[in-house]
Amino acid sequence: TLTQCDSSSLQMADASVDNVLLFFLLHEQPEHVRRGTLAEAMRVVRPGGKIVIVDYHKPGPLHPLRLLMTGVFRKLEPYAMDLWENELEAFLPEGVKPAAARKRTWFGGLYQQVVWTR
């Protein structure tokens, strides 16, 4: 089942879903909403379930698009730079951590896929 709703205030029971997918969402959210989104994702996923996050990631210093993307983010994506400056776990509530975490980056580090297991 695919559910569309306010990601920072899910109307779902605790541990009620197998998986959560956050696809290019977090860079669109102010920090307080992003924190709520990740807290809610951790809350609603069953133990052993997965949270899959795909979003921007800070590319290496020699990446040919790094300078361009910095300008794009500053003008058009004001919350995206947070994802360059912090690991995603930094936005989780204090004391909340995934049981396991795996991160892969693509296109020279410009994009990331993070999979958390609860």
Protein language model features and the residues they cover:
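C-terminal alpha-helical "lid/dimerization" subdomain adjacent to the S-adenosyl-L-methionine
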Residues: 35, 52-113
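Class I SAM-dependent methyltransferase SAM/SAH-binding core
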Residues: 1-9
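A short glycine-rich, Lys/Arg-flanked "PGG" loop and its adjoining helix->strand segment in the class I
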Residues: 35-47
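Active-site beta-strand termini and strand-to-loop segments that position acidic
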Residues: 116-118
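Conserved Rossmann-like nucleotide-binding pocket used by diverse enzymes
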Residues: 3, 21, 52
